[in-house]
Amino acid sequence: MKVRPSVKKMCDKCKVVRRKGVVRIICENPKHKQRQG
């Protein structure tokens, strides 16, 4: 899980999800998991 000020899709399979006001990226590739914070 990467925590970044700005999250971007890293590949076609990345999805942007908002959970409790937090923007997250979920993907098949575990390296692409990100959270904004």
UniProtKB/Swiss-Prot annotation:
Coiled-coil stretches noted in the UniProt entry, renumbered to this chain: none
Pfam families with a match to the protein in the record: Ribosomal_L36
Entry keyword annotation includes Ribosomal protein: yes
SUPFAM superfamilies the UniProt entry points to: Ribosomal protein L36 (SSF57840)
GO BP annotations, alphabetical order: translation
Keyword set includes Coiled coil: no
Annotated protein name in UniProt: Large ribosomal subunit protein bL36
Lineage of the species this protein comes from: Bacteria, Pseudomonadati, Campylobacterota, Epsilonproteobacteria, Campylobacterales
Gene name linked to the record: rpmJ
